[in-house]
Design a protein with these regions (language model features):
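Active-site beta->alpha loop and helix N-cap motifs at the rims of alpha/beta catalytic domains
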Residues: 66-90
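N-terminal amphipathic alpha-helix/helix-capping segment at the start of soluble metabolic enzymes
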Residues: 1-18, 133-140
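Conserved anion-binding
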Residues: 78, 93-164
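Active-site-adjacent beta->alpha loops and helix N-cap segments on the catalytic face
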Residues: 46-60, 75-79, 97-110, 127-132, ...
Length: 211
């Protein structure tokens, strides 16, 4: 199972242990990689590090055959392109608020004609600086895990359609921002928050029951 990607393991029904990386210390990253986690998320949205710092972290982790995911700073196509180019195993995009934004995130991850990601395969860490150009698009389709965060009332209202967007692998609830959007910052026991949380969770409970 360890030889499978996170995406493949999740599809097989495996339960994985992951952690967030907020400290941009290569030594801390090495310790984390040796601690038995299945995956990790390098946080560029709220963490203090830059994209260059993320590369250093990934280099430290790669010595232990550990490939992390990255939370991007936003869904801006230029941001997404630069994150993908350094070669994470997956990416989380914060605060996707509508079906169109979800579609735009998917398109930003794909080369033409299916998307609008800029192509420079010989220059990318993601392709081994040109060593693994052949098959990279297939790897992206089969192994790369694309996660979007649901953090607003607008997203909850459109959750059925957002979840149906082809190319989105996972929804991840951002509880603090979601509670703020609902006018109940940090009030996780409020009716507004519980109703929104249950609406998202029941979407997947219903899918499982149908199967």
């Amino acid at each position: 199972m360890k030889n499978l990607s996170v995406k493949q393991q999740l599809r097989s029904g495996a339960r994985l242990n992951g952690c967030w990386i907020e400290s941009f210390s290569a030594i801390a990253a090495e310790i984390m990689a040796m601690s038995g986690y299945d995956t990790a998320m390098i946080d560029l949205e709220h963490g203090p590090g830059s994209l260059t710092d993320a590369v250093v972290m990934m280099q430290a982790l790669s010595a232990h055959q550990f490939k992390p995911m990255i939370r991007a700073t936003s869904g801006d196509p230029a941001v997404i392109k630069r994150v993908l180019d350094i070669g994470p195993l997956g990416m989380m995009v914060p605060n996707v608020r509508s079906v169109q934004e979800a579609r735009d995130v998917v398109a930003a991850c794909r080369y033409g004609p299916d998307g609008f990601r800029g192509a420079a395969p010989a220059l990318l860490r993601a392709t081994g600086y040109g060593e693994h150009v052949t098959g990279y698009e297939q790897w992206m389709a089969e192994e790369f895990l694309l996660i979007i965060q649901i953090e607003s009332k607008e997203a909850v209202d459109a959750i059925d359609d957002i979840a149906a967007v082809e190319g989105i692998d996972m929804l991840f609830i951002g509880p603090i921002d979601l509670s703020a959007s609902l006018g109940a910052l940090g009030q996780f026991d409020s009716t507004e928050f519980i109703d929104a949380f249950e609406k998202i969770c029941l979407l997947y409970t219903s899918d499982a029951a149908d199967e």
